[in-house]
Structure formats: structure tokens, C-alpha cells
């Protein structure tokens, strides 16, 4: 997406604490360029107070231009851009609460319709990547929303500045799992509060909310993005193996919440919490990588044929291949079912009938669960198809 703008564009000054109906249809307003964004964030100082604007209305109108939406209730917009450090007006926390849920549901609907054969596990990973603090913080950063936040917390400026500088140095702008500088939560909170404000202003119309915010969320993280990006858990194991460190990940449930805790040589390193076990592991692994990056270099690379990356999406990928080739869907069968000292072990096979006379068959590796065994057979089927030049 081209984020270039005209040379005369300037960031509006930051608002100090003391801000009719939908806009006619028009193209979205131009975004600030990367240079403009980083010039603004580099000007932030943890010791410098916020600079007042000549008019709160100008600040609010600028936000409306970014959203390409004009609020009927201006108080909602003012509330959405008021941080808790400002005490002269209700803060954005309530709107953030409803915005978080609304954006999550809107993304869920989109993914459900976009990937009709994707399994719930993979849909959860995709949704998490698109509504994570990391993703939404980058959206706020790219659209320059932080400059309009009414705040009285100079320490936030330093965190946002550090994050902005780190993002500016990245080669790949579509980072699905996040970089090594933790995204400031305030950036994601601001985006969610604006989503909540719009959602309330459109009378809780989820479809209208999605129409307004879909463009802001671009590029939306896709299944291919997740497969191509280095996966934090895999990176962590490879990194620790390289430096002869022992890594261990423990998982347990606390009510409906999954908790993942990572130990490095039996010392607590990081933890993560989420509704989904795999997402909790991702959160913990990202935090562990950030901490380890202070000790030794973390290379953001991984073998693209890594089984750990591909197994998660192998069945979905194989379904997509069959659909494209106009083959019937694969048939999975349990070939081996036995018990061992490690518990139950399974081996599954995948079959694809590509013609009346020809059926492709592939067995997978031994796994602890049937679904994983099916994914393993799908993974090996894909590799065999590549080697046999079917793909």
C-alpha cells in the first residue's frame, strides 16, 4: 500500500488535556509518509510536556479524516482519544472494551467467510495475528493516531518513540508475530477505543464498522503470511539449541485461560496468557525472544520447509491444492494406533484419488494425537507432490 503524501502535509500538534452526520463519500485521506511519522516520534521527549493545539476541533477533524468517517456524537470521539492520564473527561477505557470485542468479531466473520475449509485452530491463530496488540499498535503507528491522543504521560512518548524507531529499521513491513521491541499497549488501546466509538456511533452495526475499519487494518494477515513468517516458538528452540541452552515450555489452565511459562536452564524467562493454548505459547515465546535479544543476536530466519511451521496448516494447504487441481478432498485414515511409555501414538495416511486409475498415498510420522498425525501425512503429501512436479 502506498502511504506517500503531498509535501505540504504536517503532523498536527499533540493535544493537551483541558475536544453532524456521516461524511459524503470520498476516497480515504492520504496517510502520513514513514518519514513524517518517524520525524514526529523522534521529536517526542519523556521530559517534554504535550504541545497544545489551537483547536480541539481541528484534532478531532483530523482523526475523522483518517477514519474517513464523521461522528454524529462528537463526545464519543473525544472520549476515544482521551487517555487515563487526563482527568478532565472520561477516558477511552469503556470504548476500548467494546471496540476490542467488536473488532474481534468483525475479523472472525471475515476469516470465517474467507477460509471456508480452515479448521478452528488455524482460524484462531489468524484472528489472533490480526487483532493482537502488536498488529493494532502498528496500525495506529502507521496512521499517526498517537499524535491526537489527549494525554499527560510523558513516559508513553518515550515508549512509542522507541517502538517507532524499531519499526522504521525493519526490512519487512508485514511482521505477523512482531519485532523485538514490545509494542506499546497504548497504541492498540487507542485503535480499539476508536473502533468502539464508531461502533456505538453507528448504533452497533457491525457491518458498517467493518466497512469503515477494513482499509485501516490492511494489510490483513493471511494464512500465507503466517506460513512465511518465522514462528516465535520455533525460533526460540533453534536459538537456544544454537547457544546450547535448555528451553522448556509448561502449559496449564486457569479457568478458561491458558497459561504458558518458559524456562531457560530451569530459570523463569517469560510467560503468556490467552484463551487459546497455542496463542499463549506464541505470546510467551515473543517475550522470551525479546529478553534473549539483549544477551545474544536473534536471527529472524527459519527454514521454509520446517515441519513445525508447516504442520499447523498442512491439511488446509492440501485442501487448497486439491481445490485448485480440481481433485477430491484427501481422505485420512489411522494406520497405526498403539500405546507406549509416552502414551498413545498414532500414524495416519492421506489418500487423494486424482484419476479413476490413480490414487496418491502417503503415510505421516508418528504423533501423540490423531489430528497431528493427519497433519503430518498432509505435510508429507505436499512435499511428495512438489518433488513429483505435481505442483
Swiss-Prot record:
Cellular component annotations (GO), alphabetically ordered: cytoplasm; nucleus
Principal location class: nucleus
Enzyme class: hydrolase
Required co-factors: Mg(2+); Mn(2+)
Motif Bipartite nuclear localization mapped to chain: 371-387
Residues the record lists as binding Mg(2+): 96, 189, 192
EC numbers on record: 3.1.26.-
Disulfide bonds: 240-322
Tissue and organ expression note: Expressed in seeds, leaves and flower buds.
Subcellular location: Nucleus; Cytoplasm
Known role: Ribonuclease that cleaves double-stranded RNA (dsRNA). Required for 3'-external transcribed spacer (ETS) cleavage of the pre-rRNA precursors. May promote the production of 21 nucleotide small interfering RNA (siRNA) during post-transcriptional gene silencing (PTGS).
Protein name per UniProt: Ribonuclease 3-like protein 2
Organism: Arabidopsis thaliana
Lineage, broadest ranks: Eukaryota, Viridiplantae, Streptophyta, Embryophyta, Tracheophyta
Gene assigned in the entry: RTL2
Amino acid at each position: 500500500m502506498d502511504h506517500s503524501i503531498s509535501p505540504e502535509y504536517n503532523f498536527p500538534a499533540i493535544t493537551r488535556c483541558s475536544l453532524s452526520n456521516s461524511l459524503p463519500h470520498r476516497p480515504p485521506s492520504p496517510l502520513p509518509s514513514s518519514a513524517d511519522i518517524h520525524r514526529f516520534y523522534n521529536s517526542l521527549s519523556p521530559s517534554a510536556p504535550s504541545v497544545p493545539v489551537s483547536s480541539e476541533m481541528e484534532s478531532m477533524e483530523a482523526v475523522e479524516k483518517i477514519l474517513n468517517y464523521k461522528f454524529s456524537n462528537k463526545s464519543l470521539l473525544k472520549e476515544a482519544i482521551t487517555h487515563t492520564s487526563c482527568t478532565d473527561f472520561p477516558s477511552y477505557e469503556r470504548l476500548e472494551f467494546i471496540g476490542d470485542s467488536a473488532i474481534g468479531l468483525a475479523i472472525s466473520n471475515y476469516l470465517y467467510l474467507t477460509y471456508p475449509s480452515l479448521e478452528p485452530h488455524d482460524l484462531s491463530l489468524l484472528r489472533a495475528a490480526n487483532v493482537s496488540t502488536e498488529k493494532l499498535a502498528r496500525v495506529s503507528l502507521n496512521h499517526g493516531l498517537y499524535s491526537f491522543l489527549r494525554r499527560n504521560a510523558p513516559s508513553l512518548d518515550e515508549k512509542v518513540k522507541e517502538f517507532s524507531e524499531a519499526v522504521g529499521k525493519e526490512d519487512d513491513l508485514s511482521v505477523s508475530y512482531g519485532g523485538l521491541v514490545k509494542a506499546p499497549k497504548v497504541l492498540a488501546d487507542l485503535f480499539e477505543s476508536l473502533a468502539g466509538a464508531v461502533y456505538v456511533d453507528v448504533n452497533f452495526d457491525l457491518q458498517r464498522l467493518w466497512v469503515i475499519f477494513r482499509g485501516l487494518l490492511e494489510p490483513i494477515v493471511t494464512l500465507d503470511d503466517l506460513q512465511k513468517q518465522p514462528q516465535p516458538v520455533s525460533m526460540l528452540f533453534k536459538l537456544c539449541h544454537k547457544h546450547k541452552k535448555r528451553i522448556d515450555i509448561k502449559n496449564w489452565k486457569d479457568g478458561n485461560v491458558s497459561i504458558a511459562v518458559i524456562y531457560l536452564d530451569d530459570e523463569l524467562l517469560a510467560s503468556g496468557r490467552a484463551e487459546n493454548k497455542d496463542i499463549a505459547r506464541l505470546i510467551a515465546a515473543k517475550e522470551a525472544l525479546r529478553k534473549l535479544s539483549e544477551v545474544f543476536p536473534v536471527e529472524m530466519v527459519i527454514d521454509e520447509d520446517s515441519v513445525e511451521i508447516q504442520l499447523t496448516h498442512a491439511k488446509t494447504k492440501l485442501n487448497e491444492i486439491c481445490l485448485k487441481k480440481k481433485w477430491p478432498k484427501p481422505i485420512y485414515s489411522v494406520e497405526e494406533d498403539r500405546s507406549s511409555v509416552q502414551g498413545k501414538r498414532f500414524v495416519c495416511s492421506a489418500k487423494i484419488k486424482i484419476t479413476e486409475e490413480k490414487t496418491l498415498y502417503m503415510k505421516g510420522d508418528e504423533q501423540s494425537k490423531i489430528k497431528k498425525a493427519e497433519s503430518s501425512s498432509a505435510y508429507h503429501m505436499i512435499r511428495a507432490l512438489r518433488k513429483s512436479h505435481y505442483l
